[in-house]
Amino acid sequence: MVESMIDRVLLELNRTDGVKGSMVVGKDGLVIASQLPGNVDAELVGAMASAAFGAAERTSSEIGLSGLEQTMIEGEHGKTLMVDAGEGILVVLTDAKVNLGLIRITMKRAADKIKAMF
């Protein structure tokens, strides 16, 4: 039930211009829900995103920043953005030219909806 509700949020998020796909992973790296393109290994991306977000949280804490809001990995062909979603991490894959302001607002709203489901 919760998974199908999360899938609806992800499908809505995926309609944002520049978004290639999205998923929610547990802090342990296990996939909770995924709406990624077929050529993307959700299990692998979920595990790696969880590890990257966890490392960013630890780094943020170590240097005195409180409450990590977002982590972004930027490459030549796109970006991977991660935000805290309560019991999970919202991961969004985008193209290189995505409007970061728009995607950040859209992700915040989606993460708030997902947090309310747990």
UniProtKB/Swiss-Prot annotation:
GO biological process: cellular response to amino acid stimulus; positive regulation of TOR signaling
InterPro entries: LAMTOR2-like (IPR037587), Roadblock/LAMTOR2_dom (IPR004942)
Gene Ontology terms for molecular function: guanyl-nucleotide exchange factor activity; molecular adaptor activity
Family in the record: To M.jannaschii MJ0310 and MJ1340.
Stated name of the protein: Uncharacterized protein MJ0714
Species per Swiss-Prot/TrEMBL record: Methanocaldococcus jannaschii (strain ATCC 43067 / DSM 2661 / JAL-1 / JCM 10045 / NBRC 100440)
Source species taxonomy: Archaea, Methanobacteriati, Methanobacteriota, Methanomada group, Methanococci
